[in-house]
Amino acid sequence: MSVKEESFEKALARLERIAVALEAGDVPLEKGVALYKEGMGLVASCRKRLEAARLEISLAGEDGAVVPFDVADDEAARDGGPAGEES
């Protein structure tokens, strides 16, 4: 199955299995390189899917207008401070 045909969840699970195998350090060099390349492809695919999902998520602003979701604003709201402010 190609990377594009896999669901995000399956791609992420495969990426986790690759990371475990590479971290164990007991794979032959050639297999390790192949796993690394596959993993990098999965990372790119997952990032692209996450970005597409982020763009689809929107929130209603105070004036009722739809505004893009901003992770920094969400994290700041959970931390109790304005976005961009470090505590």
Curated annotation (Swiss-Prot):
Signal sequence range: none
Reactions catalysed, as given in the entry: Exonucleolytic cleavage in either 5'- to 3'- or 3'- to 5'-direction to yield nucleoside 5'-phosphates
GO BP: any one term: DNA catabolic process
Gene3D superfamilies according to UniProt: Exonuclease VII, small subunit
Pfam families: Exonuc_VII_S
Keyword Nuclease: yes
Keywords: Cytoplasm, Exonuclease, Hydrolase, Nuclease
GO molecular function list: exodeoxyribonuclease VII activity
Catalytic activity, EC: 3.1.11.6
Major localization listed first in the record, in broad terms: cytoplasm
Protein function: Bidirectionally degrades single-stranded DNA into large acid-insoluble oligonucleotides, which are then degraded further into small acid-soluble oligonucleotides.
Protein name stated in the entry: Exodeoxyribonuclease 7 small subunit
Organism: Solidesulfovibrio magneticus (strain ATCC 700980 / DSM 13731 / RS-1) (Desulfovibrio magneticus)
